[in-house]
Design a protein with these regions (language model features):
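C-terminal helical "lid" subdomain and adjoining coupling/linker elements of P-loop NTPases
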Residues: 11-14, 178, 193-248
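Walker A/P-loop
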Residues: 17-55, 79-82, 149
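Short glycine-rich substrate-engagement loop in P-loop NTPases that contacts/grips substrate
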Residues: 55-84
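Conserved catalytic/switch belt of AAA+ P-loop NTPases
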Residues: 95-127, 133-136, 140-144
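Flexible beta-alpha connector loops of hexameric P-loop NTPases
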Residues: 62-73, 96-107, 152-154
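Conserved C-terminal "switch" segment of AAA+ ATPases
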Residues: 49-54, 134-140, 146, 155-200, ...
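Pre-Walker A (pre-P-loop) alpha-helix and adjacent loop at the N terminus of AAA/AAA+ ATPase modules
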Residues: 1-23, 194
């Protein structure tokens, strides 16, 4: 997309017509695989390339778009879209907008979104996110969605080594370190978790939760020790990881 935008700019500089294309995307993948982070980066890139004036990201989901009573969903959806103008609107678990049957107000949100995407096509980029199979069914079920969203980007689950690297980054950022045995215990645990992972596996979120549990267990272990030196305060021991795993 970036190359196309740059080339369009060069065409304009040479007096050639610029071709307009839709930049809307569908992000597929499990939770915690970086979809929101990439959407935020994408918004910034679009601003730098001159596609968007603000380049901010507005995150929402079904709850942010659908109201409880008839006639209110369009109003609610329009308010969210207004805040996203000149930026990117990120709708997480977008497929839930069409899961409530024909009488569900989610269809009103979809209709409102499609109209605003057309009316504000120069000021709004929409990213729909969710599980792969659900998103494909969702997009294919609606001609309006199908005609506007043809760009799919899949976010695969992290490997055990990648999850361990993320875990270590969380530790390093807060000046914690793992003992050698704690490192082995963590690596073994993550390998097992990835092996049995299902669609609801949290990936980076899962690792973040493990990190928070580990430092909590360390605090519990050291709380009654008066003479804690700097190394003790930094080091996460194997028993901290074991107790964290037991609570996961």
């Amino acid at each position: 997309m970036a190359n196309f935008i740059k080339l369009n700019r060069k065409r304009t500089e040479q007096g050639l017509p610029a071709t307009q294309i839709a930049y809307h995307c569908v992000f597929t993948g499990n939770p915690g695989t970086g979809k929101t982070t990439v959407a935020r980066l994408l918004a910034g890139i679009f601003k730098e390339l001159g596609v968007l004036k603000k380049g901010h990201l507005v995150e929402t989901d079904r709850a942010g778009l659908v109201a409880e009573y008839i006639g209110q969903t369009a109003v609610k959806t329009n308010k969210i879209i207004d805040t996203a103008l000149d930026g990117v609107l990120f709708i997480d678990e977008a497929y839930t907008l069409a899961q409530g049957g024909n009488q569900d107000y989610g269809h009103e949100a979809i209709a409102t979104l499609l109209k605003r995407m057309e009316d504000n096509r120069d000021r709004l980029i929409v990213v729909l996110a969710g599980y792969g199979s659900e998103m494909k069914t969702f997009i294919e079920s609606n001609p309006g969605l199908r005609s506007r969203f043809s760009r799919y980007i899949n976010f695969p689950d992290y490997t055990p080594n990648e999850l361990l690297e993320i875990f270590l980054k969380y530790l390093s950022k807060q000046q914690y370190v793992l003992s050698e045995s704690a490192m082995a215990q963590t690596a073994n645990f993550l390998t097992k978790e990835v092996g049995k992972a299902k669609n609801d596996f949290g990936n980076a979120r899962f690792v973040r939760n493990l990190f928070e549990k580990a430092i909590t267990q360390q605090a519990n272990r050291l709380a009654n020790i008066e003479s804690c030196d700097k190394d003790m305060l930094k080091r996460i021991e194997e028993e901290d990881i074991i107790k964290s795993i037991q609570r996961t």
